[in-house]
């Protein structure tokens, strides 16, 4: 840390009125690119319009203008998010049974969608309890609203209106900061100031505000709800905020005010800031006093972090200095030159952010069931399954996006002359070693993981169960995973003396928690079946990484195409006369990576769905006997491929296949339709461009004969457009099929 003199004067970081607001210009399709602004001559124009509308690099080379467009677009994105949130809250206010769910969350199912009676569609309005007919929703909003202390549909209505106001504000900000007062490039590149503001402001004050809301509003309201008080009798948020005596009735330490804080007797506040661990037995969710404590702690951490970076005052860290000091004995120049990359290539910045956010999203999906954060979430199995699946898919897409933007950075923004012998350069120089080793790992994992299943199927088919890998024959126990589970289960006694339970019941070491005779969470046993499927996870993830990393490391050049950088991020082949050079662009690696990402996530969500139904979810009798939904069949059945097909896919598809004529029939139609969308994708993926061009020319000839030929000349999709349409339908069809399969099943049996 170095001390230096403060900056002499305040720099003006904003340019006034840089771009005219012109509705005439915006009304012209393709106004952002010269070749598109001319209008269509062939049908390829509409595809290029969509491909390039947000590719700001292709509109201009001016980094400042690109930065402003991205910044402005972020406000537009936030506005859309606010509108979406407003819609969610409005449905809760206008079309839902939230208040009756709040009165009886164990018997009433959440619904916030009522289908209009058009051609018999009202069949979809199932009986969700409490005298309400509607579609059961699985987004978890009801549980979130209860946790935040919302007790009436009027409050939801007000929040919905507030979100629309914020959306308007965001749209205005997006326009204002591009057309009226646009930041200069130096402002976007001032990373220390940005780190301080984002860490202290967004994360620090944001967490502090949420902790404050939890302490003053959510905790007392939830305490009263848990005690069975009628929501209409509970004080309103403003009454709790303004009247300390009301709070002191639930949490006595409020009567002492801030004296314990300033006299450092912080333990006085332990009635509303707890460290209990485990789940609240009434709601099956985390103790809200634990989560309030957590957010307060997070706020303190980030408020400190937001004062760490050196700006006008000459003290604190410099990101550039930290990166350049980051050298080791085997790493050459270390991270020298990385700072310049991250302040001039937004693709490089985005790649890192997407990889991090994608990984965090996947971690969130695991925490949603292992540490259910909201009341009555854990016993709403359909919502649990939906939240896990949703966050897994999102995480997968974000990670593929990270590889896409990393490759775009390498093609468009990487300057080899400024990156000599730093870590990035060294990775690119020994890319052959990395990729060939990774390839070997993939082959090893693939043959061995799949081989274990094939062995089991063969032994099963030959009637030799004693020679199978299973918990009752040849055991392959996941001993490391079991050791980790055990360590966490024993932790409260040794590492956290004040905690009464572990971080999650899933680790084991305690009894299950049941709410109204339904299992919220129980210790999750791991055995041979989990060992087998975990190695399939390892295999699919490593193949995904192989494809994506090869795309990034060979994006600029390869032995096959040394001048790949000149061909750009996406190109079909290396020109005429060079056979065997098709489908080698960085874009094609992203395309292939998407399929393996889909494989990876599918195996994960199938594993989760079956494992939870078999070993966790179920009902508890008055005598304490637990009966799981599929009766614990995972350990024996999932050790063969045949078991996955017969006892998971086929057995659990019965609900969606037999859903016709019931309130779940929409899932039956979706199951059918999404299979069709998926199959439609194969038409784009298996046939070549020339086939379609010939067909089109024949059809155009017929139109000319009848003198009804269009002015815009029809063209077959380019190779890349065809593959893009193909992978889109493949993923959408596959995901919607899985969605219908999961929900029809779990809504029926959960």
Swiss-Prot record:
[4Fe-4S] cluster binds at residues 573, 582. Chlorophyll a' binds at residue 675. It comes from the Eukaryota. It is a multi-pass membrane protein. GO terms for molecular function: 4 iron, 4 sulfur cluster binding; chlorophyll binding; electron transfer activity; magnesium ion binding; oxidoreductase activity. It is an enzyme of class 1 (oxidoreductase). Its main location: plastid. It holds the Pfam family PsaA_PsaB. GO terms for cellular component: chloroplast thylakoid membrane; photosystem I. It is found in: Plastid, Chloroplast thylakoid membrane. Keywords: 4Fe-4S, Chlorophyll, Chloroplast, Chromophore, Electron transport, Iron, Iron-sulfur, Magnesium, Membrane, Metal-binding, Oxidoreductase, Photosynthesis, Photosystem I, Plastid, Thylakoid, Transmembrane, Transmembrane helix, Transport. GO terms for biological process: photosynthesis. Coiled coil: none annotated. Chlorophyll a binds at residues 683, 691. Disulfide bonds: none annotated. It catalyses: reduced [plastocyanin] + hnu + oxidized [2Fe-2S]-[ferredoxin] = oxidized [plastocyanin] + reduced [2Fe-2S]-[ferredoxin]. The chain crosses the membrane at residues 70-93, 156-179, 195-219, 291-309, 346-369, 385-411, 433-455, 531-549, 589-610, 664-686, 724-744. Its EC number is 1.97.1.12. Phylloquinone binds at residue 692. P700 is a chlorophyll a/chlorophyll a' dimer, A0 is one or more chlorophyll a, A1 is one or both phylloquinones and FX is a shared 4Fe-4S iron-sulfur center. Belongs to the PsaA/PsaB family. The PsaA/B heterodimer binds the P700 chlorophyll special pair and subsequent electron acceptors. PSI consists of a core antenna complex that captures photons, and an electron transfer chain that converts photonic excitation into a charge separation. The eukaryotic PSI reaction center is composed of at least 11 subunits. PsaA and PsaB bind P700, the primary electron donor of photosystem I (PSI), as well as the electron acceptors A0, A1 and FX. PSI is a plastocyanin-ferredoxin oxidoreductase, converting photonic excitation into a charge separation, which transfers an electron from the donor P700 chlorophyll pair to the spectroscopically characterized acceptors A0, A1, FX, FA and FB in turn. Oxidized P700 is reduced on the lumenal side of the thylakoid membrane by plastocyanin. This is Photosystem I P700 chlorophyll a apoprotein A1. It comes from Adiantum capillus-veneris. The lineage of its organism: Eukaryota, Viridiplantae, Streptophyta, Embryophyta, Tracheophyta.
């Amino acid at each position: 840390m170095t001390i230096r003199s403060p900056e002499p004067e305040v720099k003006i970081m904003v340019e006034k009125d840089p771009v005219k607001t012109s509705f005439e210009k915006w009304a012209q399709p393709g106004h952002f690119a010269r070749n598109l602004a001319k209008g269509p001559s062939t049908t390829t124009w509409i595809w290029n319009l969509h491909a390039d509308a947000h590719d700001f690099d292709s509109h201009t080379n001016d980094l400042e203008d690109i930065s402003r467009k991205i910044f402005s677009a972020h406000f537009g994105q936030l506005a859309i998010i606010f509108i979406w949130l407003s819609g969610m809250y409005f449905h809760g206010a206008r079309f839902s049974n939230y208040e009756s769910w709040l009165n009886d969350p164990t018997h009433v199912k959440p619904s916030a969608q009522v289908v209009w009676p058009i051609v018999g569609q009202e069949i979809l309005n199932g009986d969700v309890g409490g005298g309400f007919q509607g579609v059961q929703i699985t987004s978890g909003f009801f549980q979130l609203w209860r946790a935040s202390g919302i007790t009436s549909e009027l409050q939801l209505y007000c929040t919905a209106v507030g979100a629309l106001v914020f959306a308007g504000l965001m749209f205005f900000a997006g326009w204002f900061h591009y057309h009226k007062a646009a930041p200069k490039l130096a402002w976007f590149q001032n990373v220390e100031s940005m780190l301080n503001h984002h860490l202290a402001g967004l994360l620090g004050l944001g967490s502090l505000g949420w902790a404050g809301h939890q302490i003053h509003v959510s905790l007392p309201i939830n305490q009263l709800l848990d005690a069975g008080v009628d929501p209409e009798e509970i004080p309103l948020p403003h009454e709790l905020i303004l009247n300390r005596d009301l709070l002191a009735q639930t949490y006595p330490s409020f009567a002492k005010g801030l004296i314990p804080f300033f006299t450092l007797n912080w333990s006085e506040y332990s009635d509303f800031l707890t460290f209990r661990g485990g789940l609240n037995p009434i709601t099956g969710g985390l103790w809200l006093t634990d989560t309030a404590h957590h957010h307060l702690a997070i706020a303190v951490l980030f408020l400190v972090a937001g004062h760490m970076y050196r700006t006008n005052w000459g003290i604190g860290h410099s990101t550039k200095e930290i990166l350049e000091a980051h050298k080791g004995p085997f790493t050459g120049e270390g991270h020298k030159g990385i700072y310049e990359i991250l302040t001039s290539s937004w693709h490089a910045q985005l790649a890192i952010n997407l990889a991090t956010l994608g990984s965090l999203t996947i971690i969130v999906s695991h925490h949603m069931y292992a540490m259910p954060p909201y009341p009555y979430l854990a016993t709403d199995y359909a919502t649990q399954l939906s939240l896990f699946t949703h966050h897994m898919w999102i995480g997968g897409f974000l990670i593929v996006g990270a590889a896409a933007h990393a490759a775009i950075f390498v093609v468009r923004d990487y300057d080899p002359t400024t990156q000599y012998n730093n870590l990035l350069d060294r990775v690119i120089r020994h890319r052959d070693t990395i990729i060939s080793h990774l390839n070997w790992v993939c082959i090893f994992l693939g043959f061995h993981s799949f081989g274990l299943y094939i062995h089991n199927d063969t032994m099963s088919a030959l009637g030799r169960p004693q020679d199978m890998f299973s918990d009752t024959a040849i055991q392959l126990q996941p001993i490391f995973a079991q050791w980790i589970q055990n360590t966490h289960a024993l932790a409260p006694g040794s590492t956290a003396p004040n905690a009464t339970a572990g971080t999650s019941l899933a680790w084991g070491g305690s009894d299950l928690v049941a709410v109204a005779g339904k299992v919220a969470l129980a210790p999750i046993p791991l055995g041979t079946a989990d060992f087998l499927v975990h190695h399939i996870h390892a295999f699919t993830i490593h193949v995904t990484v192989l494809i994506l990393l090869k795309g990034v490391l060979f994006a600029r050049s390869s032995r096959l195409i040394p001048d790949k950088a000149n061909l750009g991020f996406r190109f079909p082949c290396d020109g005429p006369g060079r056979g065997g050079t098709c489908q080698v662009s960085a874009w094609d690696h992203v395309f292939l990576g998407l399929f393996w990402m889909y494989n990876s996530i599918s195996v994960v969500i199938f594993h989760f769905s079956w494992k939870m139904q078999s070993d966790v979810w179920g009902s508890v009798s008055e005598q304490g006997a637990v009966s799981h939904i599929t009766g614990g069949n995972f350990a024996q059945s999932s050790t063969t491929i045949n078991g996955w097909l017969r006892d998971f896919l086929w057995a659990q598809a019965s609900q969606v296949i037999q859903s016709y004529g019931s309130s779940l029939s929409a899932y039956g139609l979706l199951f059918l339709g999404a299979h069709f969308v998926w199959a439609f994708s194969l038409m784009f993926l298996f046939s070549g461009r020339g086939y379609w061009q010939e067909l089109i020319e024949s059809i155009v000839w017929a139109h000319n004969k009848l003198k009804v030929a269009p002015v815009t000349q029809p063209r077959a999709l380019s190779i890349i457009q065809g593959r893009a349409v193909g992978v889109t339908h493949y993923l959408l069809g596959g995901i919607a099929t899985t969605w219908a399969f999961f929900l029809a099943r779990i809504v029926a049996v959960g």
